[in-house]
């Protein structure tokens, strides 16, 4: 019996229209997801196109075909990373890194200690004003100052200020992580904190002996803004790597271009003749050898991981090196200004003003060239203004605890963050401790202290670019390169502890007993920092689950800056207890060595697999929640239509039965 192929009446095929024009209730979940996935990127005009964008060469056409053109969410920017976008990323490192080298690691602690000392008295009688630290005699006692009713050593004033600033910074970073991951806020927040931080640094020009507490407040504001902006900058790095043309090409299998091959240009009889002349057996290849060579298999997961890690490390190293070059140039200018102004407090304030101006001016290219790269928007909860901002902050803190729970499932993330917690604290504490040691114990003048940072920055440039060459030469993995840097880093506190050996102390040299000894140690510190800054950031970026960059980099920043609350505080307590800085080298020696075992056990390939699985589970969970929400809304809408049409509710109808 033949099947009935007659068309059914239209009334039997069409679904009854719902009243009140509720078009969305009649759409399937698939249709809605298709609408979301096919939304175009209309968030901003494309002002980042280079002059080569219009080039219609075959190479560009092939690259265009490999673009990930299907957006993941409304406003998703899936364009390949452009050269101008990379320059914008480097530009902000060029602008802001000067604050770290010339400001927080050099002249800010010097200025804070100087201002505190000008307001301090000797602990021996608590009446005699303290002299300048660069001319202090060995027989002088401790210099103390009262801050909010607390008696602290003037050398500890800067350490405690740094601790407060990084605590505030950690709290702020958590609060903004949600806005960075969701919506078109990543770039906006980056620029906002850049302007706030740079203007705060310029405001040091107004700080005097009478309002030195305001100088500490500016330190908190500027350091907090810098840290928040760099968290946002770091969250761009995985996106720049993911959409880099080299990575896109590695992820897509290459197929033969038959239109440009010899199949198209050869006469038909020659092609057939060649095929007929070739004996065909069970083991014959499907393609002719010369045609099969045109096929390129898709890169393996390990090869893609290696490619992304190499690219991430290179971009990160260039960013660090670019920032170091800028800081080196500006530091030399600042030293010249200090010498011309006779190493006065006014000279220190002027150079900090110059640092703020530099930060402001060179943020402009980053603002012009860096693409926003929006994340998926949050669900509209109907809140506006301040309430919407509070909702974002609350969601960010909830996300932090959720991110911590997710990170606990990633072994390599846990190992890295634990090691980075200690290592970043050691980096920050060693820098500030060394500057204060040189100023208060070795009595070095401000221009000489500035030379310490010139040497460390110069060495940092070679370290940023040289460690990649070293790792290739010795075939070192990223975590192995970090371990080598840690081993060199350990030499700094150990050298300071040599001053406790009686025979070294009798020599009067070595063990940080002479000012010139600070310079070779500064070179070691710079080389180490140049490697750690680039490799740690890129290694962590490869372990982050895709789609959670800002949230996990917020956790990275909390681990980084949050740990720096402890180091300076402990060193400050040691100074208050002993009256000298040298005992702090015992603490630094332990702090530098602890991260090594944790870094040793990191496996990047395993970490990327676990991160990808976690990202997939998060996506599946979100899709399932959306499906359930859409199904529920559609059922409620259909039920409402039915009730309006029949004049009674389902419950009433059941009750009537």
From Swiss-Prot:
Query: Mind listing the GO biological process terms from this record?
Result: amino acid transmembrane export from vacuole; autophagy
Its job: Vacuolar effluxer which mediate the efflux of leucine and other amino acids resulting from autophagic degradation. The release of autophagic amino acids allows the maintenance of protein synthesis and viability during nitrogen starvation. Autophagy is required for proper vegetative growth, asexual/sexual reproduction, and full virulence. Autophagy is particularly involved in the biosynthesis of deoxynivalenol (DON), an important virulence determinant.
Keyword annotations:
Amino-acid transport, Autophagy, Glycoprotein, Membrane, Transmembrane, Transmembrane helix, Transport, Vacuole
Lineage runs: Eukaryota, Fungi, Dikarya, Ascomycota, Pezizomycotina
Biased composition regions of type Low complexity, renumbered to the chain: 1-15
Question: Which residue positions carry a glycan here?
Answer: 343
Which parts of the sequence lie on the Vacuolar side of the lipid bilayer? Answer: 113-155, 209-212, 339-349, 406-409, 468-481, 537-554, 605-657
List all topological domains (Cytoplasmic). Answer: 1-91, 177-187, 234-317, 371-384, 431-446, 503-515, 576-583
Compartments, as annotated in UniProt: Vacuole membrane
Q: What is this protein called?
A: Autophagy-related protein 22
Compositional bias of kind Basic and acidic residues:
632-657
Hey, which family's this protein in?
Belongs to the ATG22 family.
């Amino acid at each position: 019996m033949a099947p009935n192929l007659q068309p059914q009446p239209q009334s039997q095929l069409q679904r009854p229209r719902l009243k009140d024009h509720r078009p969305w209730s009649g759409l399937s979940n698939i249709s809605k997801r298709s609408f979301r996935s096919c939304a175009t990127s209309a968030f901003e005009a494309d002002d980042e196109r280079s002059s080569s964008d219009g080039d219609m060469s075959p190479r560009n056409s092939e690259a265009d075909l490999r673009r990930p053109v299907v957006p993941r969410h409304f406003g998703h920017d899936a364009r390949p990373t452009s050269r101008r976008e990379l320059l914008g990323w480097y530009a902000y490192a060029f602008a802001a890194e000067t604050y770290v080298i010339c400001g927080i690691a050099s002249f800010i602690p010097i200025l804070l200690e100087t201002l505190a000392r000008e307001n301090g008295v000797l602990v021996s009688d608590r009446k005699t004003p303290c002299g300048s630290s660069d001319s202090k005699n060995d027989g002088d006692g401790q210099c103390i100052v009262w801050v909010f009713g607390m008696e602290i050593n003037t050398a500890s004033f800067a350490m405690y200020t740094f601790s407060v600033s990084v605590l505030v910074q950690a709290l702020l970073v958590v609060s903004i992580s949600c806005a960075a991951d969701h919506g078109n806020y990543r770039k906006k927040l980056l620029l906002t904190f850049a302007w706030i931080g740079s203007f705060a640094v310029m405001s040091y020009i107004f700080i005097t002996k009478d309002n030195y507490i305001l100088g500490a407040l500016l330190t908190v504001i500027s350091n907090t803004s810098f840290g928040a902006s760099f968290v946002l900058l770091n969250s761009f790095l995985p996106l720049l790597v993911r959409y880099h043309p080299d990575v896109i090409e590695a992820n897509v299998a290459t197929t033969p271009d038959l239109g440009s091959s010899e199949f198209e240009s050869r006469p038909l009889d020659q092609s057939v003749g060649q095929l007929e002349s070739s004996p065909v057996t069970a083991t014959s290849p499907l393609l002719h050898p010369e045609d099969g060579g045109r096929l390129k298999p898709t890169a393996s997961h390990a090869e893609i991981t290696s490619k992304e890690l190499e690219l991430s490390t290179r971009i990160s190293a260039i960013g660090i090196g670019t920032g170091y070059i800028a800081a080196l140039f500006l530091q030399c200018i600042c030293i010249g200004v200090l010498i011309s102004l006779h190493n006065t407090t006014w000279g220190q304030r002027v150079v900090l003003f110059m640092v703020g101006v530099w930060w402001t001016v060179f943020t402009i290219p980053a603002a012009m060239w860096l693409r926003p790269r929006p994340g998926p928007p949050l669900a509209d909860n109907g809140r506006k203004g301040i309430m919407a901002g509070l909702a974002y902050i609350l969601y960010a803190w909830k996300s932090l605890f959720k991110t911590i729970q997710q990170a606990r499932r990633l072994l390599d993330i846990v190992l890295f963050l634990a090691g980075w917690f200690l290592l970043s604290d050691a980096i920050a504490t060693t820098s500030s401790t060394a500057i204060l040691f040189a100023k208060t114990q070795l009595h070095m003048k401000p221009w000489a202290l500035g030379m310490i940072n010139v040497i460390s920055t110069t060495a940092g440039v070679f370290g940023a670019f040289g460690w990649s060459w070293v790792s290739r030469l010795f075939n070192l993995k990223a975590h192995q390169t970090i371990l080598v840097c840690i081993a060199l880093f350990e030499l700094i506190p150990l050298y300071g502890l040599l001053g406790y050996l009686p025979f070294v102390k009798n020599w009067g040299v070595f063990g940080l007993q002479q000012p010139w000894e600070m310079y070779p140690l500064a070179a070691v510190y710079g080389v180490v920092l140049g490697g750690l800054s680039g490799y740690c950031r890129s290694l962590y970026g490869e372990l982050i689950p895709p789609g959670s960059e800002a949230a996990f980099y917020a956790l990275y920043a909390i681990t980084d800056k949050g740990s720096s609350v402890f180091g300076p505080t402990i060193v400050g307590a040691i100074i208050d207890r002993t009256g000298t800085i040298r005992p702090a080298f015992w603490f630094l020696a332990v702090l530098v060595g602890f991260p090594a075992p944790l870094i040793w056990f990191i496996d990047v390939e395993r970490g990327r697999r676990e991160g990808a699985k976690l990202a997939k589970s998060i996506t599946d969970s979100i899709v399932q929640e959306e499906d359930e929400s859409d199904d529920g809304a559609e059922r409620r809408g259909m039920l409402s239509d039915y009730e309006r049409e029949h004049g009674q509710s389902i419950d009433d109808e059941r009750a009537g039965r």
